[in-house]
Amino acid sequence: MLNFLPGNPQDLKPKITVIGVGGAGGNAVNNMIASRLEGVEFIVANTDAQAINQSRTERRVQLGTTVAQGLGAGSRPEIGRAAAEESLEEVIGQIAGANMVFITAGMGGGTGSGAAPVIARAARDHGILTVGVVTKPFHFEGAHRMRTAEGAIEELSQYVDTLIIIPNQNLFRVATERTTFADAFKMADDVLYSGVRGVTDLMIMPGLINLDFADIRTVMSEMGKAMMGTGEAEGDKRAIEAAEAAISNPLLDDTSMKGAKGVLINITGGMDMTLFEVDEAANRIRDEVDPEANIIFGSTFDEKLNGKMRVSVVATGIASEAAAQPKPTVVSLNTPQAQPQPRVAAGGTAGAGFRPAVVTAQAAPAAAVAVAQAQPQMEARTVAQPAPQPAHQPVVTAQVRVQPAAARPAQQPMAETFRPDPQLRLDPVLERPVPATTSLQADFRADPDMGHLSQAVSHIAETAQAAPQPQRQPEIQRQQAPQPQRQPEPEARRSGGLFGLLRRPAAAQPAPQPQRHEPAPMAQQPRQEPARMGNMATRSEPSVARAGEDLDIPAFLRRQAN
Protein backbone atom coordinates (compact mmCIF):
# COMPACT_ATOMS: atom_id res chain seq x y z
CA MET A 1 0.00 0.00 0.00
CA LEU A 2 1.39 3.38 -1.02
CA ASN A 3 1.19 6.42 1.23
CA PHE A 4 1.09 9.84 -0.43
CA LEU A 5 2.01 13.05 1.28
CA PRO A 6 -0.93 15.42 1.49
CA GLY A 7 -0.79 18.69 -0.34
CA ASN A 8 1.89 20.17 -2.54
CA PRO A 9 5.50 19.16 -1.62
CA GLN A 10 6.58 22.74 -2.28
CA ASP A 11 4.65 23.82 0.79
CA LEU A 12 6.93 21.77 3.04
CA LYS A 13 10.03 23.77 2.21
CA PRO A 14 11.29 26.20 4.85
CA LYS A 15 9.99 29.68 4.38
CA ILE A 16 12.44 32.55 4.91
CA THR A 17 11.20 36.14 5.11
CA VAL A 18 13.18 39.37 5.12
CA ILE A 19 11.34 42.38 6.52
CA GLY A 20 12.82 45.83 6.20
CA VAL A 21 11.74 48.31 8.89
CA GLY A 22 12.14 52.04 8.32
CA GLY A 23 14.03 53.82 5.58
CA ALA A 24 17.32 51.94 5.93
CA GLY A 25 15.56 48.59 6.08
CA GLY A 26 13.57 49.40 2.95
CA ASN A 27 16.76 50.30 1.07
CA ALA A 28 18.36 47.00 2.10
CA VAL A 29 15.36 45.10 0.79
CA ASN A 30 15.52 46.95 -2.53
CA ASN A 31 19.21 46.09 -2.93
CA MET A 32 18.57 42.42 -2.18
CA ILE A 33 15.73 42.30 -4.68
CA ALA A 34 18.00 43.90 -7.27
CA SER A 35 20.56 41.15 -6.58
CA ARG A 36 17.89 38.53 -7.46
CA LEU A 37 18.15 36.53 -4.29
CA GLU A 38 16.02 33.40 -4.65
CA GLY A 39 13.97 31.49 -2.10
CA VAL A 40 13.21 34.54 0.08
CA GLU A 41 10.11 36.68 0.58
CA PHE A 42 10.49 40.42 1.15
CA ILE A 43 8.33 42.77 3.22
CA VAL A 44 8.74 46.47 3.98
CA ALA A 45 7.19 48.30 6.94
CA ASN A 46 7.48 52.05 7.38
CA THR A 47 5.70 55.08 8.80
CA ASP A 48 6.63 57.15 5.74
CA ALA A 49 4.10 56.63 2.95
CA GLN A 50 6.38 58.16 0.33
CA ALA A 51 9.19 55.68 1.12
CA ILE A 52 6.80 52.75 0.94
CA ASN A 53 5.65 53.74 -2.54
CA GLN A 54 9.26 53.57 -3.76
CA SER A 55 9.72 49.97 -2.59
CA ARG A 56 10.29 47.19 -5.13
CA THR A 57 8.24 44.63 -3.22
CA GLU A 58 4.50 44.33 -3.32
CA ARG A 59 4.16 43.29 0.31
CA ARG A 60 4.02 46.57 2.20
CA VAL A 61 2.78 47.58 5.64
CA GLN A 62 1.92 51.17 6.48
CA LEU A 63 2.75 51.58 10.17
CA GLY A 64 0.72 53.92 12.36
CA THR A 65 -1.91 55.28 10.04
CA THR A 66 -3.45 57.12 12.98
CA VAL A 67 -0.30 57.93 14.95
CA ALA A 68 2.07 58.92 12.15
CA GLN A 69 -0.48 59.60 9.38
CA GLY A 70 2.04 58.56 6.76
CA LEU A 71 4.44 61.40 7.61
CA GLY A 72 7.16 59.39 9.34
CA ALA A 73 8.30 59.20 12.95
CA GLY A 74 10.46 62.32 12.97
CA SER A 75 13.48 60.55 14.51
CA ARG A 76 11.41 59.83 17.61
CA PRO A 77 11.53 56.17 18.66
CA GLU A 78 8.39 56.50 20.78
CA ILE A 79 6.40 57.43 17.65
CA GLY A 80 7.80 54.43 15.79
CA ARG A 81 6.98 52.14 18.71
CA ALA A 82 3.40 53.41 18.93
CA ALA A 83 2.98 53.07 15.17
CA ALA A 84 4.18 49.46 15.25
CA GLU A 85 1.80 48.65 18.10
CA GLU A 86 -1.06 50.11 16.12
CA SER A 87 -0.30 48.05 12.98
CA LEU A 88 1.04 44.94 14.73
CA GLU A 89 -1.83 42.68 13.59
CA GLU A 90 -1.13 43.48 9.96
CA VAL A 91 2.56 42.76 10.40
CA ILE A 92 1.83 39.39 12.02
CA GLY A 93 -0.44 38.51 9.10
CA GLN A 94 2.41 39.17 6.66
CA ILE A 95 4.99 37.02 8.46
CA ALA A 96 2.60 34.20 9.33
CA GLY A 97 3.85 30.81 8.17
CA ALA A 98 7.51 31.85 8.01
CA ASN A 99 10.11 29.60 9.60
CA MET A 100 12.83 32.22 9.73
CA VAL A 101 12.62 36.02 9.73
CA PHE A 102 15.45 38.45 9.07
CA ILE A 103 14.61 41.88 10.48
CA THR A 104 16.81 44.59 9.03
CA ALA A 105 16.70 48.21 10.13
CA GLY A 106 18.84 51.25 10.67
CA MET A 107 19.23 52.18 14.33
CA GLY A 108 19.22 55.78 15.48
CA GLY A 109 16.12 57.01 13.68
CA GLY A 110 12.48 56.88 14.70
CA THR A 111 10.83 53.99 12.84
CA GLY A 112 13.72 51.53 12.87
CA SER A 113 14.64 52.15 16.52
CA GLY A 114 11.06 52.06 17.78
CA ALA A 115 9.28 49.56 15.53
CA ALA A 116 11.96 46.87 15.03
CA PRO A 117 11.90 45.61 18.65
CA VAL A 118 8.10 45.42 18.58
CA ILE A 119 8.08 43.37 15.36
CA ALA A 120 10.86 41.09 16.63
CA ARG A 121 8.95 40.39 19.83
CA ALA A 122 5.81 39.48 17.88
CA ALA A 123 7.74 37.17 15.53
CA ARG A 124 9.48 35.36 18.35
CA ASP A 125 6.24 34.94 20.28
CA HIS A 126 4.89 33.04 17.26
CA GLY A 127 7.79 30.58 17.31
CA ILE A 128 9.65 32.06 14.36
CA LEU A 129 13.46 31.95 14.31
CA THR A 130 14.31 35.66 14.42
CA VAL A 131 17.58 37.17 13.25
CA GLY A 132 18.26 40.88 13.50
CA VAL A 133 20.64 42.65 11.12
CA VAL A 134 20.95 46.33 12.02
CA THR A 135 23.26 49.23 11.32
CA LYS A 136 24.68 51.92 13.61
CA PRO A 137 24.96 55.55 12.49
CA PHE A 138 28.08 57.35 11.34
CA HIS A 139 30.09 59.39 13.82
CA PHE A 140 29.24 62.60 12.01
CA GLU A 141 25.55 62.00 12.74
CA GLY A 142 26.09 63.07 16.33
CA ALA A 143 26.20 61.61 19.81
CA HIS A 144 22.44 61.89 20.36
CA ARG A 145 21.65 59.65 17.41
CA MET A 146 24.33 57.20 18.54
CA ARG A 147 22.81 56.97 22.03
CA THR A 148 19.40 56.35 20.51
CA ALA A 149 20.84 53.57 18.36
CA GLU A 150 22.58 51.89 21.27
CA GLY A 151 19.42 51.95 23.35
CA ALA A 152 17.40 50.45 20.52
CA ILE A 153 20.01 47.73 19.91
CA GLU A 154 19.93 46.83 23.59
CA GLU A 155 16.16 46.49 23.46
CA LEU A 156 16.21 44.55 20.19
CA SER A 157 18.73 42.04 21.51
CA GLN A 158 16.15 40.85 24.05
CA TYR A 159 13.70 39.71 21.37
CA VAL A 160 15.88 38.15 18.65
CA ASP A 161 17.67 34.81 18.58
CA THR A 162 20.71 36.18 16.79
CA LEU A 163 21.81 39.78 16.32
CA ILE A 164 24.29 41.09 13.75
CA ILE A 165 25.48 44.70 14.04
CA ILE A 166 27.04 46.65 11.17
CA PRO A 167 28.46 50.08 12.11
CA ASN A 168 28.30 52.46 9.16
CA GLN A 169 31.59 53.95 10.33
CA ASN A 170 33.30 50.71 9.31
CA LEU A 171 32.50 51.49 5.70
CA PHE A 172 35.58 53.69 5.68
CA ARG A 173 37.67 50.54 6.06
CA VAL A 174 36.68 49.29 2.63
CA ALA A 175 35.75 52.52 0.86
CA THR A 176 38.19 54.57 -1.18
CA GLU A 177 38.23 58.16 -2.35
CA ARG A 178 36.27 57.20 -5.45
CA THR A 179 33.62 55.15 -3.63
CA THR A 180 30.24 56.80 -4.07
CA PHE A 181 27.79 57.29 -1.25
CA ALA A 182 25.33 54.78 -2.75
CA ASP A 183 28.02 52.18 -3.29
CA ALA A 184 29.14 52.50 0.33
CA PHE A 185 25.68 51.67 1.64
CA LYS A 186 25.42 48.82 -0.82
CA MET A 187 28.51 47.34 0.83
CA ALA A 188 26.67 47.31 4.15
CA ASP A 189 23.63 45.72 2.54
CA ASP A 190 25.85 43.02 1.05
CA VAL A 191 26.52 41.73 4.57
CA LEU A 192 22.82 40.99 4.98
CA TYR A 193 22.65 39.66 1.46
CA SER A 194 25.56 37.24 1.95
CA GLY A 195 24.19 36.01 5.27
CA VAL A 196 20.74 35.31 3.89
CA ARG A 197 22.17 33.72 0.76
CA GLY A 198 24.46 31.48 2.84
CA VAL A 199 21.43 30.15 4.68
CA THR A 200 19.21 29.71 1.63
CA ASP A 201 21.93 28.04 -0.44
CA LEU A 202 22.28 25.31 2.17
CA MET A 203 18.59 24.47 1.90
CA ILE A 204 17.89 25.12 -1.76
CA MET A 205 21.03 24.60 -3.82
CA PRO A 206 21.96 20.99 -4.67
CA GLY A 207 25.11 19.54 -3.09
CA LEU A 208 26.80 16.55 -1.60
CA ILE A 209 26.29 17.72 1.98
CA ASN A 210 22.94 19.41 2.40
CA LEU A 211 21.56 20.86 5.62
CA ASP A 212 17.99 21.14 6.76
CA PHE A 213 16.36 23.98 8.59
CA ALA A 214 16.59 22.16 11.92
CA ASP A 215 20.38 22.35 11.76
CA ILE A 216 20.19 26.06 11.16
CA ARG A 217 17.84 26.52 14.09
CA THR A 218 20.23 24.60 16.32
CA VAL A 219 23.08 26.95 15.49
CA MET A 220 21.19 30.24 15.57
CA SER A 221 18.47 29.79 18.20
CA GLU A 222 19.02 31.91 21.32
CA MET A 223 22.69 32.51 20.57
CA GLY A 224 22.84 36.26 21.09
CA LYS A 225 25.42 38.25 19.19
CA ALA A 226 26.67 36.79 15.94
CA MET A 227 28.71 37.57 12.86
CA MET A 228 28.29 36.78 9.18
CA GLY A 229 30.94 36.73 6.54
CA THR A 230 31.42 35.61 2.97
CA GLY A 231 34.64 35.27 1.04
CA GLU A 232 35.20 34.47 -2.60
CA ALA A 233 38.55 33.74 -4.25
CA GLU A 234 40.16 32.06 -7.23
CA GLY A 235 43.57 30.67 -8.07
CA ASP A 236 45.78 28.07 -6.47
CA LYS A 237 45.11 29.27 -2.91
CA ARG A 238 41.44 30.02 -3.36
CA ALA A 239 40.33 27.83 -0.47
CA ILE A 240 42.51 29.56 2.16
CA GLU A 241 41.90 33.03 0.77
CA ALA A 242 38.12 32.56 0.66
CA ALA A 243 38.05 31.20 4.23
CA GLU A 244 40.18 34.04 5.61
CA ALA A 245 38.01 36.62 3.86
CA ALA A 246 34.90 35.07 5.42
CA ILE A 247 36.18 35.11 9.00
CA SER A 248 37.58 38.65 8.85
CA ASN A 249 34.67 40.82 7.80
CA PRO A 250 35.81 44.44 8.27
CA LEU A 251 32.26 45.78 8.32
CA LEU A 252 31.08 44.04 11.45
CA ASP A 253 31.07 45.54 14.94
CA ASP A 254 34.65 44.57 15.85
CA THR A 255 33.61 41.01 16.52
CA SER A 256 35.80 37.96 16.37
CA MET A 257 35.05 34.31 15.95
CA LYS A 258 37.13 33.53 19.02
CA GLY A 259 34.91 31.72 21.48
CA ALA A 260 31.97 31.19 19.12
CA LYS A 261 29.65 28.43 20.34
CA GLY A 262 27.90 27.71 17.07
CA VAL A 263 29.29 27.88 13.54
CA LEU A 264 27.52 27.38 10.25
CA ILE A 265 29.88 26.81 7.31
CA ASN A 266 28.81 26.70 3.68
CA ILE A 267 31.40 26.07 0.96
CA THR A 268 30.19 26.57 -2.58
CA GLY A 269 32.17 25.93 -5.76
CA GLY A 270 32.08 24.62 -9.26
CA MET A 271 32.47 21.05 -10.34
CA ASP A 272 36.25 21.46 -10.22
CA MET A 273 36.28 21.90 -6.42
CA THR A 274 38.45 19.23 -4.80
CA LEU A 275 38.20 17.44 -1.49
CA PHE A 276 41.53 18.83 -0.37
CA GLU A 277 40.28 22.41 -0.89
CA VAL A 278 37.12 21.75 1.09
CA ASP A 279 39.15 20.28 3.96
CA GLU A 280 41.61 23.17 3.86
CA ALA A 281 38.89 25.83 4.04
CA ALA A 282 36.92 24.06 6.78
CA ASN A 283 39.99 23.53 8.99
CA ARG A 284 40.98 27.17 8.61
CA ILE A 285 37.63 28.21 10.05
CA ARG A 286 37.66 25.52 12.73
CA ASP A 287 40.96 26.84 14.07
CA GLU A 288 39.32 30.18 14.87
CA VAL A 289 36.41 28.96 16.97
CA ASP A 290 36.00 27.21 20.29
CA PRO A 291 37.15 23.57 20.18
CA GLU A 292 33.81 22.55 21.70
CA ALA A 293 31.75 24.65 19.29
CA ASN A 294 28.85 23.11 17.43
CA ILE A 295 29.99 23.21 13.80
CA ILE A 296 27.53 22.48 11.03
CA PHE A 297 29.11 22.07 7.64
CA GLY A 298 27.53 22.06 4.22
CA SER A 299 28.79 22.10 0.65
CA THR A 300 26.92 22.92 -2.54
CA PHE A 301 27.73 23.28 -6.22
CA ASP A 302 27.17 26.20 -8.50
CA GLU A 303 28.10 25.99 -12.17
CA LYS A 304 28.62 29.75 -12.30
CA LEU A 305 31.59 29.43 -9.93
CA ASN A 306 33.91 27.36 -12.09
CA GLY A 307 37.45 28.28 -11.08
CA LYS A 308 36.21 30.04 -7.90
CA MET A 309 35.23 29.12 -4.37
CA ARG A 310 32.81 30.89 -2.02
CA VAL A 311 32.86 30.36 1.73
CA SER A 312 30.01 31.62 3.93
CA VAL A 313 30.24 31.59 7.72
CA VAL A 314 27.67 32.33 10.42
CA ALA A 315 29.22 32.31 13.90
CA THR A 316 26.89 32.64 16.88
CA GLY A 317 27.25 32.79 20.65
CA ILE A 318 29.97 35.45 20.55
CA ALA A 319 28.35 37.78 23.11
CA SER A 320 28.63 35.29 25.98
CA GLU A 321 32.39 34.92 25.47
CA ALA A 322 33.00 38.64 25.07
CA ALA A 323 31.07 39.41 28.26
CA ALA A 324 33.28 37.11 30.32
CA GLN A 325 36.57 38.68 29.26
CA PRO A 326 36.26 42.26 30.59
CA LYS A 327 35.63 41.11 34.18
CA PRO A 328 39.26 41.15 35.39
CA THR A 329 39.73 44.74 34.23
CA VAL A 330 37.62 46.21 37.03
CA VAL A 331 39.92 45.29 39.91
CA SER A 332 42.68 47.94 40.27
CA LEU A 333 40.87 51.16 41.12
CA ASN A 334 40.95 51.43 44.96
CA THR A 335 44.68 52.09 45.53
CA PRO A 336 44.66 55.93 45.34
CA GLN A 337 42.68 56.14 48.60
CA ALA A 338 45.86 55.74 50.69
CA GLN A 339 47.43 58.99 49.47
CA PRO A 340 45.69 61.52 51.76
CA GLN A 341 46.45 59.47 54.92
CA PRO A 342 50.20 60.31 55.23
CA ARG A 343 49.43 64.01 54.99
CA VAL A 344 47.12 63.90 58.00
CA ALA A 345 49.65 61.99 60.04
CA ALA A 346 52.46 64.42 59.22
CA GLY A 347 50.51 67.46 60.28
CA GLY A 348 48.53 66.01 63.13
CA THR A 349 50.19 68.15 65.80
CA ALA A 350 49.32 71.43 64.16
CA GLY A 351 45.97 72.96 63.35
CA ALA A 352 44.03 72.14 60.26
CA GLY A 353 44.81 75.47 58.68
CA PHE A 354 48.61 75.12 59.16
CA ARG A 355 49.15 71.56 57.93
CA PRO A 356 50.97 72.51 54.74
CA ALA A 357 53.28 74.90 56.69
CA VAL A 358 54.18 72.25 59.25
CA VAL A 359 55.15 69.78 56.56
CA THR A 360 57.55 72.23 54.94
CA ALA A 361 58.98 73.49 58.25
CA GLN A 362 60.02 70.06 59.48
CA ALA A 363 62.90 69.96 57.02
CA ALA A 364 64.66 72.93 58.71
CA PRO A 365 67.42 72.01 61.23
CA ALA A 366 67.05 72.89 64.90
CA ALA A 367 70.43 74.65 65.07
CA ALA A 368 69.27 77.25 62.57
CA VAL A 369 66.36 78.10 64.85
CA ALA A 370 68.72 78.66 67.80
CA VAL A 371 71.04 80.85 65.77
CA ALA A 372 68.18 83.00 64.59
CA GLN A 373 66.87 83.50 68.11
CA ALA A 374 70.27 84.38 69.67
CA GLN A 375 71.22 87.18 67.27
CA PRO A 376 69.20 90.39 67.48
CA GLN A 377 71.47 91.97 64.89
CA MET A 378 70.37 89.53 62.28
CA GLU A 379 66.75 90.07 63.26
CA ALA A 380 67.11 93.78 62.63
CA ARG A 381 68.74 93.14 59.27
CA THR A 382 66.15 90.60 58.22
CA VAL A 383 63.39 93.08 58.94
CA ALA A 384 65.17 95.52 56.68
CA GLN A 385 65.34 92.89 53.94
CA PRO A 386 61.87 91.84 52.77
CA ALA A 387 63.00 88.52 51.26
CA PRO A 388 64.20 86.64 54.39
CA GLN A 389 61.55 88.17 56.68
CA PRO A 390 59.04 85.26 56.52
CA ALA A 391 61.85 82.76 57.05
CA HIS A 392 63.35 84.00 60.38
CA GLN A 393 60.72 85.99 62.27
CA PRO A 394 58.11 83.18 62.54
CA VAL A 395 60.81 80.83 63.90
CA VAL A 396 61.74 83.28 66.69
CA THR A 397 58.17 83.72 67.80
CA ALA A 398 57.29 80.01 67.85
CA GLN A 399 58.81 78.26 70.87
CA VAL A 400 57.28 74.92 69.88
CA ARG A 401 59.24 74.96 66.58
CA VAL A 402 56.40 73.20 64.80
CA GLN A 403 54.29 76.09 63.60
CA PRO A 404 56.67 78.56 61.96
CA ALA A 405 53.99 80.05 59.77
CA ALA A 406 51.62 80.86 62.63
CA ALA A 407 53.40 84.12 63.60
CA ARG A 408 53.33 85.74 60.17
CA PRO A 409 50.26 87.93 60.59
CA ALA A 410 51.55 89.61 63.85
CA GLN A 411 54.98 90.60 65.21
CA GLN A 412 53.97 91.18 68.86
CA PRO A 413 54.79 87.62 70.06
CA MET A 414 58.48 88.39 69.30
CA ALA A 415 58.90 90.48 72.48
CA GLU A 416 56.92 87.99 74.57
CA THR A 417 58.97 84.96 73.60
CA PHE A 418 62.31 86.78 74.12
CA ARG A 419 61.71 87.89 77.76
CA PRO A 420 61.81 84.58 79.69
CA ASP A 421 64.73 83.12 77.79
CA PRO A 422 67.23 85.77 76.65
CA GLN A 423 70.57 83.99 77.10
CA LEU A 424 69.82 80.28 77.02
CA ARG A 425 70.55 80.06 73.32
CA LEU A 426 73.77 82.06 73.09
CA ASP A 427 76.01 79.01 72.81
CA PRO A 428 74.99 78.15 69.21
CA VAL A 429 76.04 81.70 68.26
CA LEU A 430 79.68 80.88 68.93
CA GLU A 431 79.35 77.78 66.79
CA ARG A 432 77.59 79.46 63.88
CA PRO A 433 78.38 83.12 63.28
CA VAL A 434 76.02 84.64 60.78
CA PRO A 435 77.97 85.91 57.78
CA ALA A 436 75.05 87.92 56.51
CA THR A 437 75.28 90.53 59.31
CA THR A 438 79.06 90.84 59.24
CA SER A 439 79.29 90.95 55.49
CA LEU A 440 76.69 93.67 55.41
CA GLN A 441 78.60 95.81 57.90
CA ALA A 442 81.98 95.08 56.30
CA ASP A 443 80.76 96.16 52.93
CA PHE A 444 79.33 99.24 54.52
CA ARG A 445 82.52 100.34 56.34
CA ALA A 446 85.20 99.07 53.98
CA ASP A 447 84.34 101.59 51.31
CA PRO A 448 87.60 103.44 50.54
CA ASP A 449 85.84 106.39 49.05
CA MET A 450 86.04 108.93 51.91
CA GLY A 451 84.30 111.55 49.86
CA HIS A 452 81.07 109.61 50.12
CA LEU A 453 81.58 109.31 53.85
CA SER A 454 81.99 113.05 54.30
CA GLN A 455 78.89 113.66 52.23
CA ALA A 456 77.04 111.14 54.35
CA VAL A 457 78.10 112.94 57.55
CA SER A 458 76.94 116.30 56.27
CA HIS A 459 73.72 114.85 54.95
CA ILE A 460 72.96 113.10 58.23
CA ALA A 461 73.64 116.27 60.22
CA GLU A 462 71.08 118.11 58.13
CA THR A 463 68.42 115.40 58.13
CA ALA A 464 68.78 114.37 61.79
CA GLN A 465 67.10 117.58 62.92
CA ALA A 466 64.53 117.75 60.15
CA ALA A 467 63.10 114.22 60.46
CA PRO A 468 63.60 112.71 63.91
CA GLN A 469 60.57 110.38 63.37
CA PRO A 470 59.66 109.78 67.01
CA GLN A 471 56.47 107.92 66.16
CA ARG A 472 58.29 104.77 64.99
CA GLN A 473 60.56 104.45 68.02
CA PRO A 474 58.01 102.95 70.43
CA GLU A 475 57.10 100.34 67.78
CA ILE A 476 60.71 99.15 67.57
CA GLN A 477 61.13 99.21 71.32
CA ARG A 478 57.97 97.19 71.78
CA GLN A 479 58.74 94.62 69.13
CA GLN A 480 62.49 94.21 69.58
CA ALA A 481 63.25 95.04 73.21
CA PRO A 482 66.57 93.14 73.49
CA GLN A 483 68.01 94.80 70.38
CA PRO A 484 70.14 97.39 72.33
CA GLN A 485 72.80 94.70 72.60
CA ARG A 486 74.16 96.05 69.30
CA GLN A 487 75.26 99.26 71.06
CA PRO A 488 78.69 97.92 72.21
CA GLU A 489 79.65 97.50 68.58
CA PRO A 490 81.11 101.03 68.31
CA GLU A 491 83.31 100.31 71.35
CA ALA A 492 84.64 97.23 69.69
CA ARG A 493 85.32 99.26 66.62
CA ARG A 494 87.25 101.93 68.57
CA SER A 495 89.49 99.39 70.26
CA GLY A 496 89.84 96.88 67.43
CA GLY A 497 89.84 99.13 64.41
CA LEU A 498 87.65 99.09 61.37
CA PHE A 499 87.97 95.37 60.58
CA GLY A 500 87.85 94.17 64.18
CA LEU A 501 84.10 93.97 64.01
CA LEU A 502 84.30 91.39 61.24
CA ARG A 503 86.36 89.04 63.39
CA ARG A 504 84.40 89.38 66.64
CA PRO A 505 80.72 89.93 65.94
CA ALA A 506 79.47 87.28 68.33
CA ALA A 507 81.85 87.87 71.25
CA ALA A 508 80.90 91.53 71.64
CA GLN A 509 77.16 90.86 71.70
CA PRO A 510 76.40 88.84 74.84
CA ALA A 511 78.17 91.09 77.44
CA PRO A 512 76.43 94.45 76.98
CA GLN A 513 72.95 93.08 76.10
CA PRO A 514 70.99 94.03 79.24
CA GLN A 515 72.91 97.29 79.97
CA ARG A 516 71.81 99.91 77.48
CA HIS A 517 68.35 100.67 76.12
CA GLU A 518 68.83 103.83 74.15
CA PRO A 519 66.46 104.38 71.27
CA ALA A 520 67.93 107.79 70.38
CA PRO A 521 71.31 106.77 68.90
CA MET A 522 69.61 104.00 66.90
CA ALA A 523 67.79 106.57 64.78
CA GLN A 524 70.95 107.67 62.97
CA GLN A 525 71.59 104.48 60.99
CA PRO A 526 69.03 105.24 58.25
CA ARG A 527 71.00 108.45 57.59
CA GLN A 528 74.14 106.54 56.79
CA GLU A 529 72.44 104.07 54.46
CA PRO A 530 70.79 106.65 52.16
CA ALA A 531 74.21 108.34 51.82
CA ARG A 532 75.49 105.33 49.94
CA MET A 533 72.81 104.92 47.30
CA GLY A 534 75.03 103.14 44.80
CA ASN A 535 75.12 99.72 46.47
CA MET A 536 72.70 99.94 49.43
CA ALA A 537 69.66 101.58 47.85
CA THR A 538 67.45 98.60 48.48
CA ARG A 539 68.59 98.16 52.06
CA SER A 540 68.49 101.83 53.19
CA GLU A 541 64.78 102.42 52.64
CA PRO A 542 63.37 99.87 55.09
CA SER A 543 66.03 100.73 57.70
CA VAL A 544 64.74 104.29 58.18
CA ALA A 545 62.11 102.86 60.49
CA ARG A 546 64.90 101.69 62.82
CA ALA A 547 66.50 105.10 63.43
CA GLY A 548 67.20 104.28 67.06
CA GLU A 549 69.35 101.33 66.06
CA ASP A 550 71.71 102.96 63.55
CA LEU A 551 72.68 106.32 65.17
CA ASP A 552 76.02 104.88 66.35
CA ILE A 553 77.21 104.32 62.78
CA PRO A 554 77.35 108.02 61.82
CA ALA A 555 79.42 108.77 64.96
CA PHE A 556 81.93 106.17 63.87
CA LEU A 557 81.97 107.52 60.36
CA ARG A 558 82.70 111.04 61.63
CA ARG A 559 85.84 109.81 63.42
CA GLN A 560 86.95 107.88 60.33
CA ALA A 561 86.44 110.95 58.15
CA ASN A 562 88.48 113.18 60.51
Curated annotation (Swiss-Prot):
The keyword Ligase does not apply. GO terms for cellular component: cell division site; cytoplasm; microtubule. It is found in: Cytoplasm. Residues 418-428 have a biased composition (Basic and acidic residues). Residues 404-413, 464-486, 500-510 have a biased composition (Low complexity). GTP binds at residues 23-27, 110-112, 141, 145, 189. PROSITE patterns: FTSZ_2, TUBULIN. Keywords: Cell cycle, Cell division, Cytoplasm, GTP-binding, Nucleotide-binding, Septation. Residues 404-428, 462-562 are annotated as: Disordered. Disruption phenotype: Essential; it cannot be disrupted. Although it colocalizes with paralog FtsZ-like, the latter cannot replace it. Its main location: cytoplasm. One of its GO terms (molecular function) is GTP binding. PANTHER family: CELL DIVISION PROTEIN FTSZ-RELATED, MITOCHONDRIAL DIVISION PROTEIN FSZA. Homodimer. Polymerizes to form a dynamic ring structure in a strictly GTP-dependent manner. Interacts directly with several other division proteins. Interacts with FtsZ-like protein (also called FtsZm). HAMAP family: FtsZ. Essential cell division protein that forms a contractile ring structure (Z ring) at the future cell division site. The regulation of the ring assembly controls the timing and the location of cell division. One of the functions of the FtsZ ring is to recruit other cell division proteins to the septum to produce a new cell wall between the dividing cells. Binds GTP and shows GTPase activity. Mild overexpression impairs cell division, leading to very elongated cells. Isolated protein forms filaments and bundles in the presence of GTP. Belongs to the FtsZ family. This is Cell division protein FtsZ. It comes from Magnetospirillum gryphiswaldense (strain DSM 6361 / JCM 21280 / NBRC 15271 / MSR-1).
